[in-house]
């Protein structure tokens, strides 16, 4: 699988398989709210019965590459949101195909909005940072239990491709901070 370095310690989706240009892309599963309205209560976490498993994948944009999504379920409807992107899926059996024309983020809803697939199509870029710089909070490939990451003015959090960071970024009364990289927070 393309993206194997990013799946350390994470479960793959049971609902979707994704290929881009004929190459497999790792599809993660994540627990999300099953309700369209969320509450903004600091410290509040939904009870487990108010959540469901969604899927997501991330890959670099390459012009002209076909995205192929396969699911075990019979596809009765398929919507790609936001609709403004104009991505028109072609459905054949249990497979969905389309071409993405630029880097973007969107959701593929099969048979309704529950258990959706979130796709993150990244610009192809190489980020250069000095990992030894004291102003860089660097997280390399692998799983990191970071807890609270306190960021001061003029500092950068760099989450490298293949990194999975469990934590929260905290920054108060600061300026010129950046959170960059292709990893997962």
Show where each model-derived region lies:
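Extracellular beta-strand-rich solenoid/capping regions of secreted or surface-exposed proteins
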Residues: 98-100, 144-155, 164-180
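Hydrophobic beta-strand core residues of beta-sandwich domains
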Residues: 61, 100, 131, 138-139, ...
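A residue-level signal for beta-strand positions that form part of recognition/binding surfaces
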Residues: 105, 136, 176
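Short, flexible coil/linker segments at or flanking structured domains
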Residues: 6, 86-88, 96, 137-139, ...
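Hydrophobic beta-strand segments of well-ordered beta-sheets in folded domains
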Residues: 65-66, 135-136, 155-156
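Beta-strand-enriched, solvent-exposed domains that form extended recognition/catalytic surfaces
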Residues: 2-131
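Extracellular beta-strand-rich, repetitive "passenger/adhesive" scaffolds
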Residues: 111, 135, 139-142, 159-163, ...
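An acidic-aromatic substrate-binding cleft motif
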Residues: 123-141, 145, 149
């Amino acid at each position: 699988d393309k993206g194997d370095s990013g799946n350390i310690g994470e479960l793959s989706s049971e609902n979707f398989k994704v290929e881009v240009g004929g190459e497999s892309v790792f599809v993660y599963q994540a627990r999300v709210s099953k309700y369209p309205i969320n509450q903004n209560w600091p410290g509040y976490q939904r009870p487990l019965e108010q959540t469901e498993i969604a899927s997501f994948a991330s890959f670099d944009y390459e012009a002209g590459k076909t995205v192929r999504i396969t699911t075990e379920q019979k596809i009765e409807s398929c919507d790609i949101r936001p609709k403004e992107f104009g991505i028109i899926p072609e459905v054949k059996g249990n497979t969905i195909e389309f071409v993405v024309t630029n880097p973007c983020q969107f959701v593929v809803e099969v048979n309704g909005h529950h258990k959706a697939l979130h796709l993150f199509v990244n610009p192809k870029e190489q980020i250069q940072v000095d990992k030894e710089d004291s102003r860089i909070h660097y997280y390399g490939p692998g799983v990191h239990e970071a807890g609270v990451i306190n960021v001061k003015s003029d500092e950068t959090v760099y989450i490298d491709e293949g990194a999975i960071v469990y934590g929260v970024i905290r920054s108060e009364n600061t300026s010129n901070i950046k959170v960059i990289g292709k990893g997962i927070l």
